[in-house]
Amino acid sequence: MAHLPLREAEDLYHVPGWGDGYYRITGQGTLAVLPLGPNGPEVDLHDAVQVLSEQGLGTPLTLRFPQILEHRVDRLNGAFHKALKDNGIKDVRYRGVFPIKVNQRKEVVQTLAKAGRKWSYGLEVGSKAELIAALTMDQNRKSLLVVNGFKDKAFLEAACEATHFKDTVVIVLDEVGELEHLIPLLDSVDRKPALGIRLKLRSKAPGKWALSGGERAKFGLTIPEVLYAVEALRQAGHLDRLQMLHFHIGSQISDIRRITQAVREATRIHCELVKMGVPLRYIDVGGGAAVDYDGSGSSGSNSANYTLEEYASSIVAQLKDVCDESGVPVPDIINESGRAVVSHHAVLIVNAIRKVPHLVLSPDEEPHDDDPTSLWNLYYTYQYLSPKNVFESFHDAVQYREDLQSLFDLGHLSLEALGRAETLFRATLGKVRDILAEEEETDTEEFEQVASLLSQKVVCNFSLFQSLPDVWGVKQQFPIMPIHRLRERPEDTATLADITCDSDGEIRRFIDLEGTKPTMATHDLRKGEPYYLAMCLVGAYQDSLGDYHNLFGETDEAWIEVDPARGNWTLTRSSSGSRVSDMLEWVRYSPADLKERIRERVKRLKDRGHIDAETAKSLTARYTGLMESSTYLEPPRAT
C-alpha cells in the first residue's frame, strides 16, 4: 500500500475547495465534519458509521448535522447585516425567508425556524401543504411569510387568514390573472395581507435554470402587466397593500455579475413605481445563491465565484447605488436562499458492494496470417507504442478498432478474431494510460478518453433516483469520496453504479481540481472489510425530489450534534429507512393481503404434493419476513 501525503489527498478530492470549513481530511486519513465551522469540534465519519452500525443503523445512511443549518442561518443573516452597516444604511432591515420547497422535512424546517428566531428569519411557501406546515412552526411572529406559486380561491383565502398567526404575510402575484380572485377577497376580509408582484425581468442567468428568468419565464408579470396590476389595485382601493417587488432568475447562479445585473434592473423598476405613488416597502431578490459543489470558485455551473458575504455585499451595494441615483429610500431586503442554507448539512454514506472491472489482458500471440490488415496494424501499434508517438498511436488504435468492428458487422471477420482484436485494443489502451501518467499528461483529452474506456464500475448500495435525483435529472455534480483510507494512494479509477435496474443509475462525472472528470479515484476492495463512500452537500432538493424507482425507499437516517465544550458528538435523532412492506403499500398493495396470498399459494403447493411441510414453513417465513426487511441490500460485505 502506497502512502498518500495529506496535501495530495486534499487535492485529489478537493475537500478544502468545496468543504467551506465544514469538511476536512484528518491526519488518520478519514473524512470529518465540523458542524460549528472550521474552529469547532469534528465528527469522524468513519467512526460515526461504525458506532451507528452497532446501534442498528445501516447503509445507505443519511447523516444530518443540524448545527450546520444553524451556522448557515447565522452566516447568511450576519452577512446582510454587515453589508448594510458597511454601506452606511440605517433603518433598513434584512428579512430573509427560507423556501420550504428546497427541503420540506419537518426536522429541517423546525431547526431553521428555531435558529432564525433571533433574526426574524421567515419562510416562503408555494402550495397549500407548505402553507400549513409553515404556520405550525415556532417562529418569531415578526418574521415574514411569503406566499408564492399559482393560487386558487381556497389557497388565497388561507393565505389571508394566515395574518392571524403572522404580523406580515405577503401574497405574491405570480401571474396577472390572480387579481380576479384577489381583489374581491381583499374587499371581504378585515385582516388584509401585504401584496407583492413577481417581475419577469429581462435579466437571466445561464445554465440549467435559465428559464427561471427572462421573458419566457414560467412565473412573473411583464412591465405592461405590472402597470395594469397597479392600476387595478388603485381603482379597487387596495394599492396600499402593494408593498413588495419580487424577482427570481434561477437556482445556483454561479456568476455574481448575473445577480447584480438583475438587482439593478429590479431596483430601477422599484424606484419608478415608488415615484408613481406605489407604497413599496420591500424588494425580494429571490433565491439563487450558489453552492460551490466543485470547489473551483468559478462561474461554472457547479460552482460559485463569490462567497455568501460577497453575495450580500453586492446586492446591498447595487440597491443603494440605484436608490441613491433615483432619490428613493432603500427598501427592506428579502431574499429566498435555500440551497446555500441547507446543502452542507446532509451527507449520504453508501457502501461499495463489488467492483466490475474492464479486463486488460496481454495479447499472447501475434495475428494470424489470414487476419485482415487492420488487425496487423493494431498489433504493430501496440508493439511500437512509446512516449514519442503515444497520442498518434491512441488515435490510430481507435480507428483500427472501428475498422475491425465494421468487418465483423459485414460478416468478414470471425467472432474469435474480433475477440483477439478487442484484447489487443485494450492492451494498447493500458499502455497509453501508463505512458500518459508517467509523462504527467493526465489533463489531456486522450487520457480522459482512455481512463473512461478502462474505468471500473463500483456498485454501491443506494438508489440514485431516491437519494441523488439531480444527478440523473439535471446532471448535477456532488462531491463524492471515500470516508476512510485517505492516506493510502488509490490505485483504481471507477464510475459508481447504484443497485436499481436502470442504466441511468450511474454516476459518470466527478469533480476535480481542474474541473470535472469521467471517473473518481478508488481503493481496492478488501474481503470482509466495508468500503464506505460519502456523497456530500446533498441537503438541498434531494429529499423532496427523490423517487421510489424499483421500490427502493428512504434510507436510514441519523442526526448528529457536537458538544462545543467537550468536543464529543451525540446521536440526537434517528430513524430506520423504508421496509419492503412500506414500499408495496405505497403502490397500493396491502401487506396483510400479500402475506395471506403467499400463505394460500404455499398451502396449495403443499396440498398438491409439490413441497413438503418443512419447505412450506420455510417458504412462508422467507417471504413474509422479507416484507419487513430493508429495501436495500444486506449490511456491507465488500469483496
Segments predicted by a language model, with ranges:
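Low-complexity, highly charged intrinsically disordered N-terminal segments
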Residues: 26-104
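A non-catalytic, amphipathic alpha-helix used as a structural packing/dimerization or gating element
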Residues: 67-75, 228, 265, 314
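Conserved, well-structured core domains of diverse proteins
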Residues: 1-58, 561, 569, 580-583, ...
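Flexible glycine/acidic-rich beta-alpha junction loops that bind and position SAM and/or redox cofactors
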Residues: 203-207, 281-300, 334-349
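Active-site-proximal beta-alpha core segment in soluble small-molecule metabolic enzymes
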Residues: 88-284, 291, 295, 305-310, ...
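Charged (often Lys/Glu-rich) extended helix/loop segments that serve as interaction or gating elements
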Residues: 314, 320-639
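Short, glycine-/Ser/Thr-/acidic-enriched flexible segments
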Residues: 30, 38, 68, 103-105, ...
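Helical (often loop-to-helix) elements that flank the catalytic cores of nucleotide-handling enzymes
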Residues: 300-315, 364
